[in-house]
């Protein structure tokens, strides 16, 4: 309605403090097992062009013990929806889509390739060993220095034969394991719009509350070091008035006693309870987010979200709409 009409600048000024930049650092962990008697793990950064990038065997379950070269990082946009630091975003921001069957096929190719490589190296190393041993056995002109070099070659060859044999046998064993699982291991952090960030260590830790891939919906929560969830003491969920856009924090009706807030009290809280209906007229739409993540967001005045406009081009159903707004990776949310 005209009463609730805002310019692009007014919308940005009122709501941008409730927008957050989301950083998801993640890797995938594969577990192979044979009904509980034996299991082994591999980690990789992503599936690309049919290959598991940066794949490595691991014995660690600690996120921070995994080499950073194995991890991928993606960015997205989130919106604060409660004073306790609950944030809504897209599922694919916190849970990048992948295909378990394609991962399994890529793993099998990787294991077979590793086995073939070991067999090739074993053949070459055994040939070298045979040359060293024959030189010692048949070369009567071999002096002490030459003899020492041949012995060093023999010892090195035998060591590499043992190493390649063990590695190959382990890959053959892994290839025979019948149970296969893939797990996403991630560390999710956020930065408030307008904040000055110099490194990822300054970002705020979050954890996943709900992930609904079918609707591309994700809910994350700002983590408190002493208490991950009950950071607000509420008799019941806060009730939001229909005047959210104008009243901001003052629209919380006293539904209970809030001991303290997770987020700074100058942050805008988005209203998810607006059931306003529209007719079929063309509706102007605004998108606020972080196109290309920190690449465009980092400014001399801190992290800044961008706001763009377009129109709803099609109401597909009650859940999905199509819109004509320019957007880049990082604006998801």
Summary of predicted features, one role per range:
Residues 1-90, 183-194, 200-201, 205-209, ...:
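N-terminal activation segment of mature serine protease catalytic domains
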Residues 20-22, 78, 85, 89, ...:
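Terminal peptide-recognition signature
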Residues 23-26, 89-91, 95-98, 289, ...:
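Sec/Tat-exported extracytoplasmic proteins
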Residues 26, 224-226, 327:
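Short, flexible loop/turn elements at secondary-structure junctions
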Residues 28-34, 96, 229, 294-296:
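Short, solvent-exposed loop/turn elements at domain surfaces
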Residues 35-37, 102, 300-303:
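Short, glycine/charged-enriched secondary-structure capping and boundary segments
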Residues 47-51, 62-63, 67-68, 73, ...:
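Flexible, gly/ser-rich surface segments that form the specificity/activation loops bordering the active-site cleft
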Residues 82-215, 224-225, 234-240:
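Catalytic-histidine neighborhood of serine endopeptidases
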């Amino acid at each position: 309605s005209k009463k609730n009409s805002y310019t692009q600048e007014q919308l940005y000024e009122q709501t941008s403090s409730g927008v957050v930049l989301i950083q998801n650092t993640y890797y995938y962990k594969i577990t192979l097992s044979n009904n509980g008697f034996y299991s082994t793990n591999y980690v990789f950064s992503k599936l690309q062009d049919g290959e598991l990038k940066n794949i490595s065997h691991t014995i660690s379950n600690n996120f921070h013990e995994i080499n950073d070269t194995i991890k991928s990082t993606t960015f997205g946009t989130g919106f604060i929806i409660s004073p306790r630091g609950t944030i809504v975003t897209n599922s694919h921001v916190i849970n990048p889509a992948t295909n378990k069957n394609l991962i399994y096929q890529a793993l099998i190719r990787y294991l077979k390739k590793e086995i073939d490589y070991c067999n090739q190296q074993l053949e070459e190393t055994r040939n070298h060993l045979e040359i060293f041993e024959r030189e010692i056995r048949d070369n009567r002109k071999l002096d002490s220095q030459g003899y020492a070099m041949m012995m060093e070659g023999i010892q090195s060859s035998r060591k590499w034969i043992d190493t390649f044999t063990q590695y190959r046998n382990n890959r053959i064993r892994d290839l025979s394991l019948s149970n296969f699982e893939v797990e996403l291991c991630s560390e999710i952090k956020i930065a408030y719009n307008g904040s000055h960030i110099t490194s990822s260590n300054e970002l705020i830790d979050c954890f996943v509350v709900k992930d609904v891939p079918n609707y591309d919906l994700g809910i994350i929560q700002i983590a408190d070091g002493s208490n991950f969830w009950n950071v607000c003491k509420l008799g019941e969920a806060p009730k939001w008035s229909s005047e959210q856009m104008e009243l901001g924090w003052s629209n919380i009706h006293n539904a209970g006693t809030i001991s303290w807030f997770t987020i700074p009290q100058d942050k805008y809280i988005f209203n998810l309870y607006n059931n306003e209906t529209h007719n079929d007229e063309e509706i102007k739409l605004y998108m606020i987010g972080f196109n290309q993540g920190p690449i465009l967001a980092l400014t001399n005045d801190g992290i800044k979200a961008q706001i763009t406009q377009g129109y709803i081009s099609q109401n597909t159903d009650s859940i999905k709409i199509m819109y004509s707004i320019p957007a880049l990776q990082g604006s998801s949310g």
